[in-house]
Amino acid sequence: MIPRTNFNFCDILYNMPKALRTVIICIIAEILNFLAADVFYHTLKIPLFFDTIFTVAVVFYCGLVPGLCVSVGYNLINSLIWVLQKGVADPFIFFYTICGILIVLSTWVVSRRKAEFKISPVVTILYLVLIALISSFCTIISSGIIDYFHYIYYDVPDMMNPIKSFTESFVNHHFSLLVSCILAQISISFADRLIATFAGYGVYRLCERFIERR
């Protein structure tokens, strides 16, 4: 245990009732998810979303229910932004909430074994890779199916252009639309899940270090 030598925001969080601390951490995570997506995708034009880094951190630090709240909240707010700001009235946008829920569930199932995570750095890495593999598989399948219906009933939003380009390439090579939508998700979704999982775990360890002083 590291002694507390000064009083700062982390000390305030530490001394709060657990429920209130969890709510504040979830709100901060929600804001940071939007900032990460805005910086990496919209500003730097990196074809990855990084909008679940802090959701993963919340799952590790606070548990399943707070993680689900952050995930569902992000997709709900994002859907409202598309409707109010961009005039996109597309019900399928909110269906990506399913992907977020699956990411939270797959992360939580493995992250419950927190004691085993710290056996050694190698074990930690293996567990994180396992989470990335499971969550990316869930994301690839669920996002691919949602994209499939997007293509049938709506024009896929511009923010999906990297994946849209891959999908059209597979279609041009005579794959079915459903298979093309799923295959197009593989490279981007796996890279996104791998980076977001490791980054989220890193944020969780920082929370332990600075809030719990462990």
Kindly give the residue locations of the regions a language model identified.
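Hydrophobic transmembrane alpha-helices
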Residues: 2-70, 76, 80, 85, 103-112, 200, ...
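Hydrophobic alpha-helical transmembrane segments
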Residues: 23-27, 68-72, 93-98, 125-133, ...
